UniProtKB/Swiss-Prot annotation:
GO terms for molecular function: rRNA binding; structural constituent of ribosome. This is Small ribosomal subunit protein uS14c. The lineage of its organism: Eukaryota, Viridiplantae, Chlorophyta, core chlorophytes, Trebouxiophyceae. SUPFAM superfamilies: Glucocorticoid receptor-like (DNA-binding domain). It holds the Pfam family Ribosomal_S14. HAMAP family: Ribosomal_uS14_1. Belongs to the universal ribosomal protein uS14 family. One of its GO terms (cellular component) is plastid. One of its GO terms (biological process) is translation. It comes from the Eukaryota. Part of the 30S ribosomal subunit. InterPro entries: Ribosomal_uS14 (IPR001209), Ribosomal_uS14_bac/plastid (IPR023036). The keyword Cell membrane does not apply.
Length: 101
């Protein structure tokens, strides 16, 4: 299980990403606009750089919601492969059962 501090840190990053998502998207769309002059582009880039570093979606890490594990996480379910297996074997995931042929 991951340290509680890592889980809390990732949670705070997620809040920051959601908070600045629209602003970042607006600035990036303005940046990709082809009719902007170089001065305007530099101003937009400066505004983008002033946003918090942790508000970038690329800084997020997929973590298991139950254990905090960072590797082997199924993004659809947001749980690690170990937890997924245990839940499936105990019958706690509806529609999921062990394969047999």
């Amino acid at each position: 299980m991951a340290k509680k501090s890592l889980i809390v840190r990732e949670y705070k990053k997620n809040i920051l990403v959601n908070k600045y998502y629209k602003k970042r998207l607006l600035l990036k769309s303005q940046l990709n606009n082809t009719i902007n002059s170089t001065d305007c582009i530099l101003k937009i880039l400066n505004k983008l750089q002033k946003l918090p570093k942790k508000s970038s979606p690329t800084k997020l890490r997929n973590r298991c919601t139950l254990t905090g594990r960072a590797r082997g996480v199924y993004s659809e379910y947001k749980i690690s492969r170990f937890v997924f297996r245990n839940l499936a074997l105990n019958g706690l995931l509806p529609g999921v059962f062990k394969a047999s042929w």
